[in-house]
């Protein structure tokens, strides 16, 4: 008989499994960093908006996912502006925008559109968002 006991309540499984994630968030948002890492993502934290956008635009192939804590940078509209500034890089790197101002979570069929999450993102909502964003990557992993 096997008994499996789940200890980590912030983690919901390793859906990110080695995915390189650029997280744009203030240093104070440790929970989001830990949740992404707990889902298997290799997280690089950036605290400055234009530095993060520069990293994505200059080498989009280096990243599997971009996650932005919009509330620290002016809300959901700031996240949408950042998405628009990415231009063609936004088509290559899936984007998750987390904001307390998000009324309805959105998981768009168009893979080029950003995923919208209500902040603070729970382990479950983040897992679903990462599965959705990394869907094509997950299909080719096996």
Which residues does each PLM region occupy?
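Short, charged/polar "capping" segments at the starts of alpha-helices
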Residues: 28-33, 75-76, 102-107
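Conserved phosphate-coordination/catalytic loops
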Residues: 2-5, 46-50, 77, 120
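Structural motif
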Residues: 23-28, 47-49, 68-72, 98-101, ...
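Non-catalytic signal-transmission and effector/linker regions of two-component phosphorelay proteins
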Residues: 1-41, 57, 61-62, 84-91, ...
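Output/docking surface of receiver
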Residues: 45-47, 96-139
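Short hydrophobic/Thr-rich beta-strand motif most characteristic of the beta2 strand and flanking loop
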Residues: 41-49, 55
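Conserved phosphotransfer microenvironments
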Residues: 53, 62-92, 100-103
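Short amphipathic alpha-helical segments
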Residues: 34-35, 57, 78-80, 108-110
């Amino acid at each position: 008989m096997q008994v499996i006991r789940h200890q980590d309540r912030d983690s919901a499984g390793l859906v990110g499994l080695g995915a390189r994630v650029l997280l744009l968030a203030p240093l104070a948002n440790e929970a989001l960093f830990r949740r992404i890492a707990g889902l298997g993502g290799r997280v690089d934290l950036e605290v400055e908006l234009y530095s993060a956008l520069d990293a994505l635009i200059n080498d989009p192939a280096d990243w599997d996912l971009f996650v932005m804590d919009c509330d620290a940078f002016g809300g959901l509209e700031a996240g949408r502006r950042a998405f628009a500034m990415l231009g063609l890089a936004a088509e290559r790197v899936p984007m998750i925008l987390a904001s307390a101002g998000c009324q309805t979570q959105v998981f768009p069929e168009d893979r080029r559109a950003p995923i919208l999450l209500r902040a603070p993102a729970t382990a479950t909502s983040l897992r679903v968002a990462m599965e959705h964003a990394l869907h094509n990557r997950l299909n080719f992993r096996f």
